[in-house]
């Protein structure tokens, strides 16, 4: 297990790269809005996908989310858009499956997130239980 720094507004947030003797490698990232690292040889990805910028902005415009929440979300949680960029930046050739974690109750859409991640990755995508 190898910890690595991730971006978040809390102190010392970490992601983890885990490998086993069979050559499987899992990257686990949650409570982060960005990962500066790229990984090769991953077989499994478990990554936060908390909100969509579009959905968040629609909820702010409709009064369902206070506008003051937007800057904090942008600096503390992975958006769908950043997750897609993260996946594009990584070697996906050995990835067997992707698990999306920590979806927002109000600012996410499970079906949309699953479809978009599958389109970008070409891999099976699962939504973690809430």
Enumerate the predicted regions with their spans:
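Core dinuclear metal-dependent hydrolase active-site scaffold
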Residues: 1-44
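Cap/insert and terminal regions of metallo-dependent hydrolase folds
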Residues: 39-129
């Amino acid at each position: 297990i190898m910890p690595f720094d991730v971006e978040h507004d809390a102190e010392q947030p970490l992601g983890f790269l885990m490998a086993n003797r069979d050559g499987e490698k899992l990257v686990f990232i949650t409570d982060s809005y960005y990962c500066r690292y790229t990984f090769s040889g991953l077989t499994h990805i478990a990554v936060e996908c908390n909100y969509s910028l579009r959905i968040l902005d629609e909820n702010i415009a409709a009064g369902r989310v206070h506008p003051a929440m937007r800057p904090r979300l942008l600096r503390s949680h992975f958006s769908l858009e950043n997750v897609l960029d993260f996946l594009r930046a990584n070697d996906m050739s050995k990835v067997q499956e992707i698990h999306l974690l920590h979806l927002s109750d109000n600012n996410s859409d499970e079906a949309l997130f699953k479809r978009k991640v599958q389109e970008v990755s070409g891999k099976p995508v699962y939504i973690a239980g809430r």
